[in-house]
Amino acid sequence: MKSHYFLILLFTFSSYFMQAQSDPNFPVQVKIESGMIEGNYDNRTGLQTYLGVPFAQAPIGDLRWKAPQALNSWTGVKITKQFGPRPVQAEVFGDMYSRSAGMSEDCLYLNVWTPANRDTKGLPVLVYFYGGGFIAGDASETRY
């Protein structure tokens, strides 16, 4: 009986460590106009992802209802591995699933997926504005 417990324990720990070592992502950094950002490289897809990259100052306080203002530069490395917050709104559709970091008026973020093996020439760019009629949705939702 004791050997069964030992085998179960051994299997549990070995499964955990095998899963931890099989993580296909590793960090990648790139310099943009405002500073350095760090995203992930996915070995399975060959894509670099940068999620929640700010593109303007937060539209709060004196900046509320104003045109977007240029982003201030930062020092150090900004981690961009999670979707930014979604706009303040209700999830009106029952099948909505958001992967964002909560809700906020500060929701001016981009998500970038780029091939890691790209040449130095320009690549086609797709800009996608998700639906929702200004009442629902965000860039982290899987349907978009």
Q: Where do the model's predicted regions map?
A:
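Non-catalytic accessory segments of hydrolases
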Residues: Q21-Y144
